[in-house]
Amino acid sequence: MATGKIIQVIGAVVDVEFPQDAVPKVYNALEVEGAAEKLVLEVQQQLGGGVVRCIAMGSSDGLSRGLKVINLEHPIEVPVGKSTLGRIMNVLGDPIDMKGPIGEEERWAIHREAPSYEDLASSQDLLETGIKVMDLICPFAKGGKVGLFGGAGVGKTVNMMELIRNIAIEHSGYSVFAGVGERTREGNDFYHEMTDSNVLDKVSLVYGQMNEPPGNRLRVALTGLTMAEKFRDEGRDVLLFIDNIYRYTLAGTEVSALLGRMPSAVGYQPTLAEEMGVLQERITSTKTGSITSVQAVYVPADDLTDPSPATTFAHLDATVVLSRQIASLGIYPAVDPLDSTSRQLDPLVVGQEHYDVARGVQSILQRYQELKDIIAILGMDELSEDDKLVVSRARKIQRFLSQPFFVAEVFTGSPGKFVSLKDTIRGFKGIMNGDYDHLPEQAFYMVGTIEEAVEKAKKL
């Protein structure tokens, strides 16, 4: 193995000089000898004269010029397979949960080619989440990609935790969770939530938190994806959760700036679309198995036209948009039923009844939205009888779209509910048809099935 020496350190960027005939390839991993903790560098550029520019995967504090660096002659490799289940790992696949070493079956490089066109497969099967608003308005496809879009504090992580809990228990498959640049506290909560729900032994957790250097946050999504690809290639249906794709983009922006590239729109890296494509094109289903991915996407300043969320939109099958306005009404999950969409919401896929109910719910809510201005200026009394009925049903539908979560029982004080798709469609169809016009709207708030709303109305 060739060895070189550090000639320059600027924050997370480290320049290493190698002999002219042994220059490492781009994306090769290098290990620093003599660093206080294990430190791996990834080659990003060859500058000529035997010098390579690298990004550090850990803190570069304490590095000095002249330190010896070994070329490992392969990209970063991480353990894959069943031994990773129930464990928390970092970007290098090293365990960080104090439970001893991972019994490695094999290691795969994190940089891999996307499957070829001939190997790809698509599925029309629906993945039932047990969350009414998602199953009704933006159904998830097995092997599809779902984005949870929302600004700060509207519930992306809580929604994701609920999805993992529901799908892991009801779906009994394996899941991989990649925490990309999120809070360490959330990672901790997440771990304990998985333990309490008894699903930890079905989940591999890979964390690269907010306090990590940008190189680490840029690569941790690929580490999680590589583990998911292994399960897929064994013929399984695996779930990949990424929280948060925006931090992946942001890490790319930081790395790009550190490497001296010219920024593009809003200061993002010029390679934004390509970097997003490299990740997203690998998250796909083949003839052997499927990867269904759920990705949280932070929306800066609630602006969906920002280049980062806008680039992500293009890759998704379903988009779940979380709205601050709905959250402010106390309706959780704060999904905007008029802004959320799914490619699966087609009568040929979900059936005519589901399609009609979903579109009916949307049209009633849309009409209510239009009438809000009139109500604000003139009051309810000025509306026609038909419009009064629309408003009354819309407010019931709005409340019935809320639901108590298992992972939020501590906050809501009510037990979580898993609602089957059949019950969801039946409930909304009943409200639209006027079967429950006599019930007060409070009865529909934070309940599971329509029967629970009827029971709640008796107590009011």
From Swiss-Prot:
List the catalysed reactions. Answer: ATP + H2O + 4 H(+)(in) = ADP + phosphate + 5 H(+)(out)
> Which keywords does this chain's UniProt record carry?
ATP synthesis, ATP-binding, Cell inner membrane, Cell membrane, CF(1), Hydrogen ion transport, Ion transport, Membrane, Nucleotide-binding, Translocase, Transport
Quick one: where is this thing mainly located?
A: membrane
Q: Which residues bind ATP?
A: G150, G151, A152, G153, V154, G155, K156, T157
Q: How does it assemble?
A: F-type ATPases have 2 components, CF(1) - the catalytic core - and CF(0) - the membrane proton channel. CF(1) has five subunits: alpha(3), beta(3), gamma(1), delta(1), epsilon(1). CF(0) has three main subunits: a(1), b(2) and c(9-12). The alpha and beta chains form an alternating ring which encloses part of the gamma chain. CF(1) is attached to CF(0) by a central stalk formed by the gamma and epsilon chains, while a peripheral stalk is formed by the delta and b chains.
Q: Relate the protein's function as given in its record.
A: Produces ATP from ADP in the presence of a proton gradient across the membrane. The catalytic sites are hosted primarily by the beta subunits.
Q: Which PANTHER family match?
A: ATP SYNTHASE, ATP SYNTHASE SUBUNIT BETA, MITOCHONDRIAL
This chain belongs to the protein called ATP synthase subunit beta
